[in-house]
Amino acid sequence: MTELKNDRYLRALLRQPVDVTPVWMMRQAGRYLPEYKATRAQAGDFMSLCKNAELACEVTLQPLRRYPLDAAILFSDILTIPDAMGLGLYFEAGEGPRFTAPVTCKADVDKLPIPDPEDELGYVMNAVRTIRRELKGEVPLIGFSGSPWTLATYMVEGGSSKAFTVIKKMMYADPQALHLLLDKLAKSVTLYLNAQIKAGAQSVMIFDTWGGVLTGRDYQQFSLYYMHKIVDGLLRENDGRRVPVTLFTKGGGQWLEAMAETGCDALGLDWTTDIADARRRVGHKVALQGNMDPSMLYAPPARIEDEVATILAGFGQGEGHVFNLGHGIHQDVPPEHAGAFVEAVHQLSAQYHN
């Protein structure tokens, strides 16, 4: 494989010295960019865009042409695994993702196959290989998956949810069925991420978007336990280099210590967690990624720079920080504000690295 020219993102995840704090943005390939909208229109719909390796590669590279980002992230969706299990993923205008055949009981779980990443999910691996080739070693490529709990919420609820009553009913009334589903998903995610790593992903991230809706006890049992299983099963070295793993539970700031015990390399923080506090608690074990409120990108560039300075000062001197937003970038953010954010991180962070 091509020699990596900019490895500061990988180095920061492993708490190794860097010249400036690396930065990328969750959903950096997305609807805030006019060129993304044009490519998506060309593809026809969202899943067609995900399934076309050349177009998925194009949208992955678009933000890198605009901004000096320190990593690319695979353009895909967390719901590829449930889709490959046969649940019939479709997107309803204004509704988000839906499934034609949601999981309602243990019998449904028993019927679910564990998808072969190079077969039913081969289009994702083709995209990874294409992106790695086209990146030409400029920056590392991040692969990702949803967490078992988060995937299960969509599969059991039949789509997006605000109250999560359907999956919580299963969790409390038929926990055995839910554990069977989560176990199957943990196996599927492990295979899927390992296939991404073999195809060329240089780091992987597990997005636990809905872990924060659980009680602490339920989080340990129904979300973290299965993420820990995945981390245990991941390829941690490929192509002669360590493959760092980041866990991100949105709303999970109270559980950082438990998350750091999984053996992951880094934790993602949302904007509700104080980064100085997070570093005091777990900075000796893991790197931290985050954590500016994505809505800050609506502010004037001078205010964005102030916020970047505050977060950098909060983390403080030394290694182990990857700058990011606390969740995905909003679709109506002015692209030049995202540019001001990226520039500010690089310009203001050099003083923290000796």
From Swiss-Prot:
EC number: 4.1.1.37
A Gene Ontology cellular-component term: cytosol
Site positions (Transition state stabilizer): 77
Alphabetical UniProt keywords: Cytoplasm, Decarboxylase, Lyase, Porphyrin biosynthesis
Key word Transcription present: no
Classification via InterPro entries: UROD/MetE-like_sf (IPR038071), Uroporphyrinogen_deCO2ase_HemE (IPR006361), Uroporphyrinogen_deCOase (IPR000257)
Record GO terms (molecular function): uroporphyrinogen decarboxylase activity
Localization annotation: Cytoplasm
Biological process terms in GO annotation: protoporphyrinogen IX biosynthetic process from glutamate
Gene3D superfamilies named in the record: 3.20.20.210
Pathway: Porphyrin-containing compound metabolism; protoporphyrin-IX biosynthesis; coproporphyrinogen-III from 5-aminolevulinate: step 4/4
SUPFAM superfamilies linked to this entry: UROD/MetE-like
Organism superkingdom: Bacteria
Record: residues binding substrate: 27-31, 77, 154, 209, 327
Catalytic activity reported: uroporphyrinogen III + 4 H(+) = coproporphyrinogen III + 4 CO2
Main function: Catalyzes the decarboxylation of four acetate groups of uroporphyrinogen-III to yield coproporphyrinogen-III.
Entry-linked PANTHER family: METHYLTETRAHYDROFOLATE:HOMOCYSTEINE METHYLTRANSFERASE RELATED, UROPORPHYRINOGEN DECARBOXYLASE
Subunit structure, as described in the record: Homodimer.
Entry's family note: Belongs to the uroporphyrinogen decarboxylase family.
Protein name as annotated: Uroporphyrinogen decarboxylase
Native species: Salmonella agona (strain SL483)
